[in-house]
Amino acid sequence: MNYSHDNWSAILAHIGKPEELDTSARNAGALTRRREIRDAATLLRLGLAYGPGGMSLREVTAWAQLHDVATLSDVALLKRLRNAADWFGILAAQTLAVRAAVTGCTSGKRLRLVDGTAISAPGGGSAEWRLHMGYDPHTCQFTDFELTDSRDAERLDRFAQTADEIRIADRGFGSRPECIRSLAFGEADYIVRVHWRGLRWLTAEGMRFDMMGFLRGLDCGKNGETTVMIGNSGNKKAGAPFPARLIAVSLPPEKALISKTRLLSENRRKGRVVQAETLEAAGHVLLLTSLPEDEYSAEQVADCYRLRWQIELAFKRLKSLLHLDALRAKEPELAKAWIFANLLAAFLIDDIIQPSLDFPPRSAGSEKKN
């Protein structure tokens, strides 16, 4: 990270004017006094040095004094960063809001991939935070985020819906009928992978739907689909059963073997026995969607779902480039400040490099000759 004053001015230009930052920091309770830190821009600079800058609190204070940024102790910095945690999150959210206004979809459907990742405190052990994010595979940029503790489960309906979107998620999101129902009767469409026993499958008459009978009735190597009703599984929040389109994508023999081998290995490691039906169902990818059959074929739905790997790669970039998986703080508010500062840096990097990615380079053969 370049810590020069010239470089900081360029970064600050992408975030906001100094007076706007002062106002937002004051409203968020991040800048209540200016005795050691003269303005919001300085506070933000210290936060970025601690987060994506990779410095410890003591290193940040030493660097700040050396470069005449601020003079304060590491304890004072800790208190300031804790108070600024929510403000850093607001700045990150504002960066995404500006991006959405610029890159908003004007025609057709917009794909939004959703997923989450766990973040652990220093010392390893169980995860303490979960970062939920939305991602646009067209612009290759994140669109939404929410930070919760590790007990907050994945929800397909976590982010606000728009009428032009198709929300795509893995089967970790396909086990809560109330969340799927929210989209089924909402503005957005959805594609979510499901487990063959993950939901209460019903026929149109309200009888139990025979999932294995459906899969066994498919022609070898062929995809198939049907309409099912999703029951509430005894959860009153899920409401009455609702219809959904179920698509079974048959895996090629070699991929089906890999899927079954992985399933056996994971369960063996956990000391569990795999049911024969579960092993049989592993030869298919089961997708649930609200997209109408007359507009989106089963193959098109499957193609959309296959784009889901892009958000997995985006998470890997966050963890490898900004070391988002190397949380430095244990104290909750300081940890939030560290995570939000890293997210803000990631969003700014995307915005800075995106114009160069959007502009196609001229090939050597296209140069005009004098």
From Swiss-Prot:
GO terms for molecular function: DNA binding; transposase activity. InterPro entries: RNaseH-like_sf, Transpos_IS4, Transposase_11. Signal peptide: none annotated. SUPFAM superfamilies: Ribonuclease H-like. It holds the Pfam family DDE_Tnp_1. Belongs to the transposase 11 family. This is Putative transposase InsL for insertion sequence element IS186A. It comes from Escherichia coli (strain K12). The lineage of its organism: Bacteria, Pseudomonadati, Pseudomonadota, Gammaproteobacteria, Enterobacterales. The gene is insL1.
